[in-house]
Amino acid sequence: MSSRSGKPRRSGLDLDALAATQQSMTHAEHEKLVKLRLTMTYYEDALKFIHLLEQGVPILVQLLASTNKAEVLESMEFFRVAHEYKIHGASDGVRAMIHLIWTKDNALVMEDGSQLKGIRSRLIEVYRSLYFDPYPGLSRSEHVALVCRNMIERTFGATLAELTSLEQLFSLMHAEGLVERAVVEKLWDVYASPLPISRAQRRGAIMILSMLAKAERELVAEKMDVLLRIGLGHVGSKDLVLAKHTCIALLHVSGSTKKVKGTLAGGHVRYPMQHPMFTRLCSIIETPSTDEKDRHSEWFGVAEQAIDAIYLLGEQPDALCTELLRHMTLAAFASTDQRTNDVYQMAQLVFVVGHVALKQMVHLELVEREFKRRKAMRDDVAQQNSGASKPATASELDQVAEQAEDDIGETMAWVRDRELLYGPESLLALYGNVVPFICSNTRQYPDIFLQRAAALTLCKFMCISAEYCEANLGLLLHLLRTSKDAVVRANAVIGLGDVAVCFGTLVDENSERLYAGLGDKDLGVKKNTLMVLTHLILNGMIKVKGQLGELAKCLEDEEMRV
């Protein structure tokens, strides 16, 4: 063998033969080889370029929040093109830019005389280009189905903040006539489909319809029978998330006309309590839920929205909710053998009590406004009738009107502070002492759902009455400091912020206790604390007394959002 003889081993590659082969190649073959090499180089450079684009996506997402308008517009255009070419991460930018809908839409003139379009109008153009413009080669029905699917898919995995911004965007687009009527009808078909479609599709359809109804209340008002039959009927009873979004859609039936400052008139539509809608709403609240998944969040979400709908749409919501609380109280305290269900029913009752109390306070404010509106109308009529005989001076009329409004305001304030939670005939007063007792006895009532509901209701009760707030403020601060449940601590922080808005002096005296949440190990508690403190400080509701260092530490936090 060659290894034994010491002779060098011959290479398997014959270089001479290779050179001879290259020399023998024809001119056409040589050109083909060069073209293949150039093509390979082109693809390599293209891949490098794509990787560089993907690396720049996170930076461009941050530029969407830039104070430089030109940078924002260029970033939006990049994500529009990148999304069409399916660049990895482009969908993150398209999803992030939706919050720009809240930007003030003012055109900007550059130094060269060119004019930059407003950010909000440009955002509408980008979304129309990506999800609404017709694709070439599609029929009319295929285009409508594609637009419908694109709109529904925008709700998949969306956060609450994203859904809020999406609602503002789609409502503006609908107000401008960019959403075709055929698309709306297709969304209703998906929502009411008798076929076993996915839950996400049906939920997405009613979410989009609810968003569009913000600009056109008739869109859901005309289909109320469908809402009651599907979302509050047999389908919604098995899918409480669908029922929740159906209740949100019902809220738009009343109309979204905002009250103009200085006026008394309101534009909400209300229905008699005999309307079948209220029977369905009460039924969805009272229906017992023993499913483990429903216990975590779904039932509480649908109950909250159902109560909101009752108070917004009903002519006498307090009477209906009184009967609702009586039925739930009897069910919670009825003797059964299933101890677990008893505790969960108690948690449901406590939650409903708290939210009814809060909505009743808002209802009293509406009643006060209605009293003032009717009195203003009577005064106008009386002034017109007596104007010819003995006209009164403007100052005299203003004094009388102001005195009457003060009397009405004082009466309502007394009812709110003394009657709702302390009145001898008040149903809510029965739970005024029960809720703090549950919160302060975690060993006796260890159920996590009951504790969360009780803490939330305690916060709502404290926003109603100054006397109740002062009596239980120490307990709420104690929960914020010692509770082992991060959800209870997070809700306690938000509750303290709400209490500070209602009764600022009480919280300002204990503001240093609020800063403790900035050092909480749970990210949700920390974010809620920072959000509440930012709101209270910027609006002058609490004073900073040497705690700036605690806020400055947040700049070094590992979490970028903090």
PLM feature spans:
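Extended alpha-solenoid helical-repeat scaffolds
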Residues: M1-V562
